[in-house]
């Protein structure tokens, strides 16, 4: 079943694969509480707190009694500081996203570091940070950021793609002299400006 496949992927830290499989499961059967609750846990582990809460709330609406989702919600809501921190993190990520879209990369990077300090599992923040470092020619930092994200979700397609691109740029840099290296980085910045950034609502 989709649920069992999703559970296996989650245990193997293929979180994006698990989320995709579990979404199919709840699409086929909206009342599949086990799949919906697990999907919420997967989202939460990826730093996607809004999506996690959404799944758990829907789950408790479908089955109010004897539902583990109620415990998840209560545990988080009882910690007022945690709720406030999570809400603040979302706002900070959206600010960082706006800075990135406007080309204010330094400010975006500062915001993303704050986001990851508060929510160290936020995959999208690592990905955007890596993209900005890549844009600035800071390949080692970009690679470090992506590798951190892949410790959380090792099969994330976007992370795999970014890591491949980073490695390609690093390999190319080794073949060029310092002057050409700087010119290449300037050209890279122009290419990255046109790249579509992640949306805070994408999963």
Can you say where each PLM-predicted feature lies in the sequence?
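TPR-adjacent "capping" and linker segments in tetratricopeptide-repeat scaffold/adaptor proteins
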Residues: 1, 77-91
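Conserved structural position within tetratricopeptide repeats
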Residues: 23-27, 58-61, 116-117, 150-151
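Helix-start (N-cap) detector for alpha-helical repeat units in TPR-like alpha-solenoids
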Residues: 33-34, 67-68, 89, 123-124, ...
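Register position in tetratricopeptide repeats
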Residues: 11, 45, 79-82, 101, ...
């Amino acid at each position: 079943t989709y649920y069992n496949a999703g559970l296996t992927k989650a245990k193997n830290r293929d979180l994006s694969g698990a989320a995709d499989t579990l979404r199919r499961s709840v699409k086929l059967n909206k009342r599949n509480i086990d799949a919906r609750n697990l999907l919420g846990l997967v989202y939460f582990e990826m730093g996607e707190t809004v999506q996690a809460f959404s799944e758990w709330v829907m789950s408790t609406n479908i089955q109010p009694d004897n539902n583990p989702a109620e415990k998840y919600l209560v545990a988080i809501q009882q910690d007022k500081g945690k709720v406030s921190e999570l809400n603040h993190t979302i706002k900070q990520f959206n600010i960082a996203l706006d800075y990135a879209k406007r080309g204010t990369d330094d400010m975006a990077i500062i915001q993303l570091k704050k986001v990851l300090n508060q929510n160290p599992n936020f995959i999208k923040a690592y990905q955007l940070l890596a993209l900005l470092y890549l844009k600035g020619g800071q390949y080692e930092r970009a690679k470090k950021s992506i590798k951190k994200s892949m410790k959380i979700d090792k099969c994330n397609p976007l992370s795999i793609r970014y890591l491949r691109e980073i490695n390609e740029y690093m390999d190319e840099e080794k073949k060029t002299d310092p002057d050409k290296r700087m010119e290449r980085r300037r050209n890279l910045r122009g290419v990255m400006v046109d790249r579509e950034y992640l949306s805070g609502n994408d999963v």
